[in-house]
């Protein structure tokens, strides 16, 4: 097919204080094998380290076919506003995001482009990701890329409420028009992926590649998301610090979920026309209420009595252990 007829893709790679890891991320987007129109936007959100210098250096050395745009904010905007700003710099029809510590497979653009051509009603397509974990004290390297799939992947339409499925920005390609529609509504500084993908869901169908991963998703040893990291339980002081960070993270997640629920309510009152039916919006609100209730439970867990924790405990030994007082629970995790 004529390359000019292939979907046009803007790859947005954002970074903030990621000098130590962003080379791999940039190398992976520079190494795409897609022959359609591509522009790559490297955007630094006011880093205090050499993140932007790495972006400049690698752009100057790049000799590939894609147009590269550099952007730097003097003052950090935060993840959500930064991504929204970078999308505003894009000129192509589809937006493919990547964080500065992740790694795209070379065929990522090509597979997404195939999916959106096969399903022209899609406003977004979501792939799977392969999680990779740092180990404290060990130099990190991404694994070798898997073998290139010989056949195009299976594609399924996501069914049910939006919040019944997981959506991660680095795993999605979204129409720019869906991002632009969402600009009319507030965006949270954290867990922005939920809201941006939700805006896409409101505008049309989301398709999934259920068996196909297209990127490596990196969990840093000190990252709050690295719940299984040995670093997290290196000592009691560190374990307790992570517990406090968890509470901050949960509050940020709750803010994002509540923003989506508020928008559902406003749409039901006629704020703006959307693709989704009244029944779908009501189902989405119910899913978000359940999420908020669960977040409240996690936030208040250590304030519950033993009997309350026991009645709410999860499955297996881990669920039983979590009924212990907090310090005993953390000590148990350190020893296991």
Predicted regions, residues:
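Cell-envelope/extracellular polymer assembly enzymes that use nucleotide-activated donors
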Residues: 7-10, 28, 39, 195
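Short, well-formed alpha-helical segments that are part of the catalytic scaffolds
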Residues: 18-31
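Acidic helix N-cap motif at the loop->helix transition within catalytic regions
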Residues: 23, 49-58, 103, 107
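A conserved acidic beta->alpha catalytic loop
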Residues: 44-53, 75, 99
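Glycine-rich, basic loop-to-helix element that forms the pyrophosphate-binding segment
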Residues: 73-90
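Short aromatic/hydrophobic "clamp" motif used to bind/position activated sugar donors
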Residues: 95
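Conserved donor NDP-sugar-binding/catalytic core segment of glycosyltransferases
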Residues: 107-141
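Conserved nucleotide-sugar donor-binding catalytic segment
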Residues: 150-237
């Amino acid at each position: 097919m004529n390359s000019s007829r292939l979907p046009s893709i803007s790859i947005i790679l954002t970074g903030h204080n990621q000098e130590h890891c962003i080379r791999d991320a940039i190398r992976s987007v520079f190494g795409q094998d897609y022959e359609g129109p591509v522009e790559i936007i490297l955007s630094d959100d006011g880093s205090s380290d050499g993140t932007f210098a790495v972006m400049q250096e690698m752009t100057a050395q790049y000799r590939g076919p894609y147009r590269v745009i550099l952007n730097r904010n003097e003052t950090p905007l935060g993840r959500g506003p930064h991504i929204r700003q970078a999308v505003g710099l894009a000129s192509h029809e589809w937006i493919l995001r990547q964080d500065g510590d992740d790694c795209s497979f070379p065929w990522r653009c090509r597979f997404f482009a195939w999916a959106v051509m096969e399903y022209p009603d899609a406003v977004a397509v979501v792939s799977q990701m392969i999680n990779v974990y740092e180990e404290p004290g060990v130099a990190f390297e991404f694994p070798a890329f898997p073998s290139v799939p010989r056949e195009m992947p299976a594609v399924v339409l996501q069914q049910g409420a939006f919040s019944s499925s997981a959506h991660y920005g680095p795993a999605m390609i979204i129409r720019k028009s869906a991002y632009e529609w969402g600009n009319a509504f507030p965006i949270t500084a954290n867990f922005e992926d939920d809201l941006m993908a939700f805006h896409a869901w409101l505008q049309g169908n989301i398709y999934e590649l259920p068996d196909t991963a297209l990127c490596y998703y990196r969990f840093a040893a000190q990252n709050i998301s690295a719940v299984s990291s040995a670093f997290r339980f290196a000592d009691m002081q560190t374990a307790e610090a992570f517990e406090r960070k968890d509470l901050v993270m949960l509050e940020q997640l709750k803010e994002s979920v509540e923003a989506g629920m508020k928008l559902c309510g406003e749409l039901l009152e006629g704020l703006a026309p959307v693709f989704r039916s009244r029944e779908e919006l009501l189902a989405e609100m119910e899913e978000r209420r359940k999420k908020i209730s669960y977040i409240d439970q996690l936030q208040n867990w250590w304030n519950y009595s033993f009997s309350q924790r026991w009645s709410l405990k999860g499955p297996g030994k881990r669920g039983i252990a979590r009924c212990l007082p907090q310090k005993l629970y953390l000590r148990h995790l350190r020893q296991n």
